[in-house]
Structures are given as structure tokens and as C-alpha cells.
Amino acid sequence: MKRIHIFGAAGSGTTTLGKALANELPFSHLDTDDYFWLTKFTHMREIEDRKKILKEDLLKYERSILSGALCGWGDSFKPCFDLVIFLWIPKDIRLERLQQREFQRYGNEILAGGSKQEQYEQFMEWASLYDHAGIEVRSKTLHESWMEDLTCPVLRIEGDYTVQERVKIILEYLRLNEKRSN
């Protein structure tokens, strides 16, 4: 096992899990936000630049865990992964996490009259679409479609688990599959 990809909806915990898993395994943690954004959450990097930088890092780090979504712009990386982990949590829990995260990032600027209010409201509206939208946006439907032609195993972790519980599930999965392949 050399490359693991963890993805799911915004607020599902992909980055947090990627970091925690990298602390347990001899893997480097990479996050798609670092490739997608030129300036975090305001200016997108050109697609070809994202791909080039990600490819360089995947070559640089022999064992890596990539968290975050690649759908659309990073489809060419699908064959690179030995395991894909899909995270899903109930919408109400996910949106509450996102509200807390955004408040920690921007404070009162997301409240009425704040400089980030409009951006925050648009982001939350977009995030709320995940469970019922079609493939035209980052949605569960798009993610399910993206997983259909993966050649590697997919481990689905669906439900409200703690980070530690998720890490335990993954380590157990890896241990069992290590035994099967020997």
C-alpha cells in the first residue's frame, strides 16, 4: 500500500482524518486544497498547474495520503491509488461542523454586515446541496459516480464516527488486507 485517497463532502472530516492517519502510518499527508487554491478559498489555481504540482508531490512522497476531492480536475490520478476511503456523515452534523469551522476561520466577519457574510452564505448553501444534488456540483451523486470505475478497493465509512474510530477502522482494514495478500 503506497497511496491512499480520502474524500467526501465538505465538513466530512477528510483532512482531519488524513492528518491523523499519517500520524499512525509512515505516510506523508497531502491535501487537495493545497493544489486547488492559489490563495486559500478565494483564487483557484489553473487546472494544469494543480495537476503538475500534485504529480510532482506524488512522485516525491512514495507513501502518501491525499485528502479532499479530485473529481473533475484530478480524474487522471485515479489509477495512482491503492485504496480510496469515502466518508459520509449526516447532513445536520456536517453543516454544524462547517458553521463552527467557518466561525473559527473568520469570526464575526461571517455574521450579518460582516465582510465575509455573502461568501459564507454562498458556501453554506453550496455545502447543503451535497446529499441531494446531481453531478453538476460536488455531491454524493458525483462522488458515487466517480468511484464507479476505480480499479482499487473502496472503503466506505458512513456515519458519525470520531477521528479515532475512523483511524481504527482503517488500520483494521489494512491489517486484514495485508494478511490476505500474504
Model regions and ranges:
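Hydrophobic anchor at the beta1->P-loop junction of P-loop NTPases
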Residues: 6
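The conserved Walker
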Residues: 10
